[in-house]
Amino acid sequence: MPSHSLLVGYHGCDRSLVESVVAGKDDLKPSQNAWDWLGHGIYFWEDSCARALRWAEAEPQRRASRIKTPAVLSAVIQLGNCLNLTETEPLALVKDAHEAYLQFCAASGSPVLENRGTALQVRFLDCAVIETVHQFRQEEGNQPFDTVCGFFVEGRALYPGAGFRELDHIQVCVRSSKQIIGYFLPRST
C-alpha cells in the first residue's frame, strides 16, 4: 500500500481559488460531505484536466455553488500510504469495514445509509464505509491512509452493450495535504 508514485491530479473549482492557491495565499479545503464516495478529503481527477473542467462547468447548475468562473487547478500528488481501490487487498479491507458498519448500525439502532441517485452519485453508504476503514486504522494504531484512489463508473454507455461509460475516470481523495507536492496551472483548459 505505501507508494512513492507521483501522479498529476486536476481539481475543478472557481478561477479565484485557482489563482489564490497558485499564489500561495490559500489552500484547498478537504470536502466533508456525507456523500463523498472516497471519504473525506481533497478530490482530484487523475490525469484528466478536461474532466475536472467539465465538472466545474456543470457544478453551478447542480446547486448553490461558489463556482462563478469554472477553472482547473493542477497538482503533483505523491500517493504515500494509499487505499487503492483498484487492488484486491484494499478492497478486502473495505468489505470488512462494511460488515463492521452494519454491525454498528444494528447495535446502535442507527439506520444503514444508502447510496442514492440514478447513477448512485450520492454515495452516503460508501462514504460511511470508507470512513469506517480510517476509524479502524486509527483505533488499531495503524498508519493512516494518506490518499484513497478509485475507479468511478459514470455517464451513458459509449455504445450499445458497452461496459465503458462517457465519464468513467479515476479519482483521488487526498486525506493528508502533505502528499500534495505542489500546485500549478494547466497549459490550457
What are these regions (language model features)?
Residues 33-59:
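Extended catalytic/binding region for NAD+/ADP-ribose chemistry, centered on the ART fold
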Residues 52-55, 64-65, 84-87:
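Short, solvent-exposed secondary-structure capping/transition elements
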Residues 18, 27-38:
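Internal mixed beta-strand/loop scaffold within catalytic domains of large alpha/beta enzymes
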Residues 7, 12, 19-23, 27, ...:
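Active-site and NAD+-binding cores of ADP-ribose-processing enzymes
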Residues 1-7:
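Membrane topogenic helices and adjacent juxtamembrane segments
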Residues 59-72:
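Cytochrome P450 catalytic domain signature, combining two hallmark sequence patches
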Residues 15-16, 49:
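Conserved nucleotide-binding/hydrolysis micro-motifs of P-loop NTPases
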